[in-house]
Regions:
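C-terminal alpha-helical interaction modules of replication/initiation AAA+ assemblies
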Residues: 164, 178-180
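BTB/POZ (also called T1 in voltage-gated K+ channels) oligomerization domain detector
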Residues: 1-81, 202-203
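Aromatic/basic-lined ligand-recognition segments
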Residues: 169-171
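Post-BTB helical module
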Residues: 68, 72-161, 165
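Terminal end segments
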Residues: 180-203
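C-terminal end of P-loop GTPase domains and the immediately downstream helical coupling element
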Residues: 173-175, 186
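Residue-level detector of functionally special positions within alpha-helical transmembrane segments
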Residues: 25, 98, 134, 200-203
């Protein structure tokens, strides 16, 4: 099965984990990713297997993810993931294949509201997912969303199962630092207000 993306005159195939073919151009891949640039620089054996008469590489990502990823390589309307979980998976793929410019573009689109982002009620799960994918930017953004929400066993429930390694410790530490900074800001604001009032009385 081939992707529905219309990419004319391809010379390479990305094959998804569910065996969907994504025709692409080697120069586009090489410019977007040092990983693929190195991969494509390797000599192709004369007896190498071909797909539709083209060299290919089998990837571990599924067709839904590659559909979005490939659409971001070309000047065509992007295929936007349907959930923040899928956006995180897309960011993780960019990280895996060293597609820094594509990853930055996706994050900019999240900021604009074009791509889905986790809601406050999804913050703890989003943090756990971002942690499992080593997405530090998304971890910090999700951690920020958890502020003001109780972090108790009763509140977290099944979300605790999603946390790995020292993710819980890191989140507790982040919340403590953020709370301290917030308290300092409030204290500074009160001090500034008192000085302003005192200055007004002297005048």
């Amino acid at each position: 099965m081939s992707s529905s993306l219309d990419i004319p005159d391809p010379n390479f195939i990305l094959l998804s984990s569910d065996q969907v073919k994504f025709p692409v151009h080697k120069p586009v891949l090489a410019m977007s990713s040092p990983f693929f640039k190195d991969l494509l620089s390797l000599c192709q054996p004369l007896d190498a297997e071909l797909v539709d008469g083209l060299p290919f590489v089998q990837l571990s990502e599924d067709a839904a993810l590659l559909n979005s990823l490939v659409s971001l390589l070309y000047p065509i309307p992007p295929i936007i993931p349907g959930s923040y979980e899928q956006v995180f998976a897309l960011l993780a793929a960019c990280q895996k294949y060293d597609m820094a410019s594509i990853q930055s573009h996706i994050r900019a689109e999240i900021e604009r509201g074009t791509f889905p982002a986790p809601a406050k009620a999804q913050a703890f799960r989003a943090y756990a997912i971002a942690n499992s994918m080593s997405l530090s930017v998304e971890m910090e953004r999700a951690a920020l969303l958890t502020l003001g929400q109780p972090m108790t066993l009763e509140h977290l429930g099944d979300e605790l199962r999603s946390f790995k390694g020292q993710a819980i410790y890191d989140l507790i530490r982040y919340r403590a630092v953020a709370a301290s900074n917030n308290s300092k800001r409030k204290g500074n604001n009160k001090s500034n207000e008192r000085r302003r009032l005192a200055s007004g009385r002297r005048q």
